[in-house]
Amino acid sequence: MPLYNHLKEHRARLGVNQQEMGRLVGVSRQTISQIERGDYSPSVTLALKLAKACQVTVETLFQYEEDNHEAIS
């Protein structure tokens, strides 16, 4: 299941750059960049911190596309 995120859009809405967002949530600029590109899936804790920093829910910030052939148990 691919994980999609809207971090870049929400970060831009707040007017903060990757460095500032990283500082707000305690990670590097490179980590923020990797998350935005989809190269890194954040931990639950980091996802919660990012959502709080962006003033949105985790569900608004991160979404996954469900594979219709894959059962969720």
Protein language model annotation of sequence segments:
Residues 5-24:
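Short basic helix-loop element that most often maps to the first helix and adjoining turn
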Residues 45-60:
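DNA major-groove recognition helix of helix-turn-helix/homeodomain DNA-binding modules
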Residues 7, 21-22, 32-35, 61:
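Conserved hydrophobic/aromatic packing and binding residues within compact polymer-binding modules
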Residues 12, 26, 37, 66:
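Residue-level detection of the helix-turn-helix DNA-binding "recognition helix"
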Residues 27-41:
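Recognition helix of helix-turn-helix/homeodomain-like DNA-binding domains
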Residues 62-73:
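Short, charged recognition helix plus adjacent turn
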